[in-house]
Amino acid sequence: MMTKHKKCFIIVGVLITTNIITLIVKLTRDSQSLCPYDWIGFQNKCYYFSKEEGDWNSSKYNCSTQHADLTIIDNIEEMNFLRRYKCSSDHWIGLKMAKNRTGQWVDGATFTKSFGMRGSEGCAYLSDDGAATARCYTERKWICRKRIH
């Protein structure tokens, strides 16, 4: 036979569990709803994976028309997320490389070489094998990124 206290603890436990589940669902939905249609939310940022192709400069311009930049890759989790969602196509990212193998992101930050970069051309893209460079006039899809405010 269950005492009043046991019933009370069970009811409180069920209510707390229900509230936690509701909060998790709401936070997940809110984070995604802060991103525009066709954009994907991850780590307080929204990402757009283009369906069309363009050279690096036109890709950068297309992102700017959406109040975004070609994506910057801040950490390995972000790199893994981008590689997972880009499917099999190569996508331009917001990194330009100089002849001396130094790189600069579109926000002005220096490329810290936190991940490998194949190739010796001027503009960076993401492939199935990671990051690489190509001639900037090559047509590729692109990835835009903007922060959630």
UniProtKB/Swiss-Prot annotation:
GO cellular component: Golgi membrane; plasma membrane
Tissue expression summary: Expressed preferentially in lymphoid tissues, and in most hematopoietic cell types.
Induction statement: By TLR activation. By IL12 and IL18.
Side of membrane Extracellular, spans: 26-149
Cystine connections: 35-46, 63-144, 123-136
Main location: membrane
Documented effect of changing residue 87 to S: Complete loss of dimerization
Bilayer-spanning residue ranges: 8-25
Source superkingdom: Eukaryota
Oligomeric form and interacting partners: Homodimer. Interacts with NKp80/KLRF1.
Protein name: C-type lectin domain family 2 member B
Name of the encoding gene: CLEC2B
